[in-house]
Amino acid sequence: MLRSTTGVGDVIGVDQRFAEVGDGRREAEHGITAYADLEDALPRVDAVVIATPPASHAPLALKAIAAGKHVLVEKPMATTTAAARMLVDAAAAAGVVLMPGHTFEHNAAVHKLRDLVRGGHLGRLFYLDCARLNLGLYQSDVNVIFDLAPHDISISNFVLGATPTAVTVWGSRHVHPEHEDVAYLRLDYADLGVRSNIHVSWLDPRKVRRVTAVGSKKMVVYDDMADGERIRIYDKSAIPPDENAAPLSGVAYHLGDVVSPFVPFAEPLAVQDQHFVDCIASNSTPCVSGSSGLAVVQALECAQISLREQRPVALAEVAQRQAGSPAGLDATIAWTSVG
């Protein structure tokens, strides 16, 4: 997909497994110039795309930024708030583009959901409910929260135009002895009076990718698995009893139409890649910036503390933490030369 992006010249690959085969074979098999060591590739590229295990994201990105390269890094941008802040500060100091791979923020259906919520079409927003479920794929280096929740945290922040003030998590291990495979997160957006509830699982019979927004007047379901009808608007609501009515008066219900507006589809990954290249060419800040990635990592760190200590954790508690240092360079990485 990178090679079909307007503005991209050569694509160079870096994978430590390439050290096991000869130059001709690795280039013939992958169709790109390939290196086993990133130090050899850095002088030949203008920008870097990092798609590696999460623990390696920050150290690899820092190395690329130090070499003056623009960076698109897969979610999560880092595994600690301190490391994510280092990336943001380093990119600003180097004058390079830093963009986290929050792919769903480039999804037209998610943009439609945001417009409906922020435009007041649902009335007063009560809550968001997100579900990201499937049977697998189990990861060996992170739990289900770090694997799947970054998507729904970024979607929630994007739709609401805010960051959570606190995170509460419940999680459990059923198959993997070290990593939670099912988790429930509650993100409190106290300034908005809204919560986003997130259910992530590697242990579910169905593949679910869904966000529900419930308001005082209408409700919306974004279902990424629904071909052609990813957005469905429900003219439904619950009407509270009149405060002047008799004590036994109950809740009334409004049941109206269900509408699925046409939302033109464009592959989000392609949109993301093109935006990254365009930002490099125009020397502009991405719509999904390093600060967006930092906010997601802060929520993830809160989630890990909440999971361990079984309590709500405020983002303010981890926002200033500088403990921990990025480590771990054993990874697969893709590099792209922009020309």
Language-model regions, residue ranges each:
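A contiguous active-site-proximal alpha/beta segment in oxidoreductase catalytic domains
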Residues: 78-140
